[in-house]
């Protein structure tokens, strides 16, 4: 269990926290955390009545985060956390989406209609939804659905004591770089995230905007709120992602087999 608390001097001029906080803001907010606080909660303080999921009243934050990592992700150690983040930054649910999109886009008009005719109730709306999202996002797919969750993983990992603050930020760097290189604003990135979430959850979005969903409304609320609007600074997309001096996701991964 790491005991190093947030030290700005420990990460030099890195701006990775400025990427991490908005990337993880929705789940931080939904789980009664503070979107401005890296790790969701202040270590040592009980998680106050979130009423959702594994986050329970009077549960020490590190226990809540460890249970979430274990129950939802099968992560029970530092090694598993680092391996999962490094892997999913490159190959997450977007791989499954692209595979499905490739299948449906490769069909003739008659083949597509035959697929719909043979599909069950859910697939009858998921195939058109997959096709529409593929046309909308192209090669980007549902990338932000994967990248944003990496922010939550490293923050939970920090809070759980599996990573130090500098290590958590360094582990997120590849995801932040991919985000910056692929999108140009938080609205665009969050629309992609929301599309990805609804695709993964197999929600029927026929005739509905992602901004009308509970998560879409949550993002708009965070962005419009005076308390949290500054998190979503589009100027970040015009700046370089500044790494943590002397640390990287690659070095953390390599150290596991050293």
Regions found by a protein language model. Give the residues of each.
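Short, small-residue-biased leader/transition segments that mark boundaries at the very start
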Residues: 1-4
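Acidic carboxylate diad motif detector
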Residues: 13-19
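Long amphipathic alpha-helical segments with strong coiled-coil/leucine-zipper propensity
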Residues: 58-147
